Curated annotation (Swiss-Prot):
<dbReference type="InterPro" id="IPR036186">
    <property type="entry name" value="Serpin_sf"/>
</dbReference>
<keyword id="KW-0011">Acute phase</keyword>
<comment type="similarity">
    <text>Belongs to the serpin family.</text>
</comment>
<feature type="region of interest" description="RCL">
    <location>
        <begin position="351"/>
        <end position="370"/>
    </location>
</feature>
<keyword id="KW-0646">Protease inhibitor</keyword>
<dbReference type="InterPro" id="IPR023796">
    <property type="entry name" value="Serpin_dom"/>
</dbReference>
<dbReference type="InterPro" id="IPR042178">
    <property type="entry name" value="Serpin_sf_1"/>
</dbReference>
<feature type="glycosylation site" description="N-linked (GlcNAc...) asparagine">
    <location>
        <position position="123"/>
    </location>
</feature>
<feature type="glycosylation site" description="N-linked (GlcNAc...) asparagine">
    <location>
        <position position="48"/>
    </location>
</feature>
<keyword id="KW-0964">Secreted</keyword>
<feature type="signal peptide">
    <location>
        <begin position="1"/>
        <end position="2"/>
    </location>
</feature>
<comment type="subunit">
    <text>Interacts with CELA2A. Interacts with ERGIC3 and LMAN1/ERGIC53. Interacts with PRSS1/Trypsin.</text>
</comment>
<protein>
    <recommendedName>
        <fullName>Alpha-1-antitrypsin</fullName>
    </recommendedName>
</protein>
<dbReference type="GO" id="GO:0005615">
    <property type="term" value="C:extracellular space"/>
</dbReference>
<keyword id="KW-0722">Serine protease inhibitor</keyword>
<dbReference type="Pfam" id="PF00079">
    <property type="entry name" value="Serpin"/>
</dbReference>
<dbReference type="GO" id="GO:0006953">
    <property type="term" value="P:acute-phase response"/>
</dbReference>
């Protein structure tokens, strides 16, 4: 039997092309994941009684984009704060990685209902470098707008209208206040409402207790389903781990810590562990109770990223000469808002289709009725779309 050398070679080149296509964002994914965990720990450290919810991908994208206009320390600080090691990855590859990532997330045929945007707002007196505007548009599909910050109310209205329009009215009044001396502001938003591959029955949802802490219990609508789930108890994390797929290449991973093990879980989570979970398909029967919730997070990134060492860009010593050559410029305000709805829905018609054979043994009852942590991962790129913690589902 003679190998067909042509065919073999053709196959080889084909796979290498395929790898190239996927390799750029693979290079940035571990950094994004570690950035997600550092940011999460930072927020958890500030308060253990509030919900946490943010989009690592979205924040990192906004600041990688901003780094295009920065120089010197301001520049390296941003990329290092996002967990990139510039001795290991050339900067061009970082931007290529984000470009691929955005391309994947914004595919028009995607069933993922994900809306994300970055708006840069500069005072009308600032003359912006053309190259910066081009890069922002070309690499990051974003826009820079000229506003009159001296008229604070009008500027605020313009920024909020941009976000409201971009999120189809889901996020209103994002910016509550602006300093009079603002010359440069960044807003970054992301909104997601996914559909489960396997929906829950609306009729099964019942009000149940959720134990916020030892002293506090609240009533929440609890979705319930007895079925086959990708769920298991992880000894290393002392937690139940549940993976649930959304239509359109996203997976939610929920972590329910054993009694008193929440902090242990928060400290132990790593990119490698998450990768292992995603590779492991481990279906078993369970009686699942998961709260229905709408969760939002709004963060002043100046404070949050400051704790991760990104401070220069917000200070008078900022070097944003790639944005404007006129006068010294600093970023006065950076706001991030993330919104997620978790409900029973799958595809509208799929309601009655799932008849599952449940094994005879008694399935464990897994109730997410106390604080839990969750991540949402985009399957193709393995990147963390969202990370959060639900301490109190009724918290507005």
């Amino acid at each position: 039997h003679v190998e067909d050398p042509q065919g073999d070679a053709a196959q080889k080149t084909d796979t290498s092309h395929h790898d190239q296509e996927h390799s750029t964002f693979n290079k940035i994914t571990p950094s994004l994941a570690e950035f997600a965990f550092s940011l999460y720990r930072q927020l958890a450290h500030q308060s253990n009684s509030t919900n946490i919810f943010f989009s690592p991908v979205s924040i990192a994208t906004a600041f990688a984009m901003l780094s295009l206009g920065t120089k010197a320390d301001t520049h390296s600080e941003i990329l290092e704060g996002l967990n990139f090691n510039l001795t290991e990855i050339p900067e061009a590859q970082i931007h290529e990685g984000f470009q691929e990532l955005l391309h994947t997330l914004n595919k028009p045929d995607s069933q993922l209902q994900l809306t994300t945007g970055n708006g840069l707002f500069l005072n009308k007196s600032v003359k912006v470098v053309d190259k910066f505007l081009e890069d922002v548009k070309k690499l990051y599909h974003s826009e820079a707008f000229s506003v009159n910050f001296e008229d604070t109310e009008e500027a605020k209205k313009q920024i909020n209208n941009y976000v409201e329009k971009g999120t189809q009215g889901k996020i209103v009044d994002l910016v509550k206040e602006l300093d009079r001396d603002t010359v440069f502001a960044l807003v970054n938003y992301i909104f997601f409402k996914g559909k489960w591959e396997r929906p829950f029955e609306v009729e099964a949802t019942k009000e149940e207790d959720f134990h916020v802490d030892q002293a506090t219990t609240v009533k929440v609508p609890m979705m319930r389903r007895l079925g086959m789930f990708n769920i298991y108890h992880c000894e290393k994390l002392s937690s139940w781990v549940l993976l649930m797929k959304y239509l359109g290449n996203a997976t939610a991973i929920f972590f329910l810590p054993d009694e008193g093990k929440l902090q242990h879980l928060e400290n132990e989570l790593t990119h490698d562990i998450i990768t292992k979970f995603l590779e492991n398909e481990n279906r078993r029967s369970a009686n699942l109770h998961l709260p229905k919730l709408a969760i939002t997070g709004t963060y002043d990134l100046k404070t949050v990223l400051g704790h991760l060492g990104i401070t220069k860009v917000f200070s008078n010593g900022a070097d944003l000469s790639g944005v404007t050559e006129d006068a010294p410029l600093k970023l006065s305000k950076a706001v991030h808002k993330a919104v997620l709805t978790i409900d029973e829905k799958g595809t509208e018609a799929a309601g009655a289709m799932f008849l599952e054979a449940i094994p005879m043994s008694i399935p464990p009852e897994v109730k997410f009725n106390k604080p839990f942590v969750f991540l949402m991962i985009e399957q193709n790129t393995k990147s963390p779309l969202f990370m959060g913690k639900v301490v109190n589902p009724t918290q507005k």
